[in-house]
């Protein structure tokens, strides 16, 4: 596994004035300490330690009162590092776990009590099974987590799934897509999979995270080629959008972003303060149960 650069943090407190009270960063990962929480042997990268104290300092700097920790692929189904972080700040944090498909109700209830509000399916950062959506198993898992009011979060490239809305029709729980749908900007906003995502969002069945523009771009900060994707989502379904920093920016190839600049980018994408308030406060409160 290859290592990654150290994470960034926001450079100054100039960003604080732009985010409303109770703003939520809905996408970040804690990694390590590796000696206490060893990484999965089948991981495709090895992150530097990215610890809760540093993450909370970043949140304070950009003005986020709440946050959601998402289980990274380097831990597979071992959620201990994420759960340890949730236990340190249960009022501020929620979690999205990775669980085996045969997870039982008792484990789901244990995770719910710890602050978990969803499960993640990552079909990108894999050695095997990459790009394959195990729909039958996912429907079964979704039925198991539905009593807790959870959702299923996907890390996938929507441009690879032109029939996405039909494949996920009548899915038992809401679905959430990371990184604006994770279509490369070269696919364009007329891409069939991206349009299918928008249809799901308009129906209230799906959410999208305004995260990781550096994972889609063919450019560099401020990633101007991602603007059209963000605008299309904001115009179509602002009630189904949430924002996240994607801290600590693992396996980023375009240069380590500054988290304050990413906060500024949301202001650029969503200049209307009322809409921004929905994306930062109301929508995540509804999805994660703050």
Spans of model-derived segments:
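Alpha-helical scaffold segments that flank or form the walls of functional sites
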Residues: 41-89, 109
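Catalytic pocket-lining loop regions of alpha/beta-barrel enzymes
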Residues: 133-243
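Conserved, mostly hydrophobic/aromatic
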Residues: 27, 59, 82, 119, ...
């Amino acid at each position: 596994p290859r290592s990654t650069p150290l994470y960034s943090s926001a450079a100054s407190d100039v960003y604080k004035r732009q985010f409303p009270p109770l703003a939520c960063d809905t996408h970040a990962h804690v990694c390590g300490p590796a000696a206490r929480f060893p990484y999965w042997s089948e991981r495709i990268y090895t992150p530097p330690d990215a610890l809760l104290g540093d993450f909370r300092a970043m949140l304070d700097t950009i003005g986020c009162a709440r946050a959601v920790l998402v289980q990274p692929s380097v831990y597979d189904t071992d959620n201990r590092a994420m759960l340890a972080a949730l236990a340190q700040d249960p009022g501020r944090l929620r979690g999205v776990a990775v669980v085996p498909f045969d997870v039982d109700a008792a484990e789901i209830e244990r995770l719910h009590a710890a602050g978990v509000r969803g499960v993640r399916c990552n079909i990108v950062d894999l050695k095997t099974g990459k790009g394959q959506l195990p729909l039958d198993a996912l429907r079964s898992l979704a039925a198991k987590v539905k009593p807790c009011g959870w959702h299923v979060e996907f890390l996938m490239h929507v441009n690879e799934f032109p029939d996405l809305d039909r494949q996920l029709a009548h899915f038992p729980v809401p679905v959430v897509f990371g990184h604006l749908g994770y279509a490369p900007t070269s696919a364009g906003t007329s891409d069939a999979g991206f349009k299918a995502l928008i249809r799901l969002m308009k129906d209230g069945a799906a959410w999208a995270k305004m995260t990781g523009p550096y994972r889609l771009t063919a450019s560099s900060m401020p990633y101007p080629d991602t603007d059209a994707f963000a605008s299309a989502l904001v115009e179509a379904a602002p009630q189904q959008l949430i924002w996240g920093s994607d801290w600590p920016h693992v396996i980023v190839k375009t240069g380590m972003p500054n988290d304050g600049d990413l906060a500024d980018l949301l202001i650029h994408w969503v200049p209307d303060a009322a809409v921004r308030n929905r994306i930062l406060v109301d929508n995540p409160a509804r999805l994660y149960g703050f």
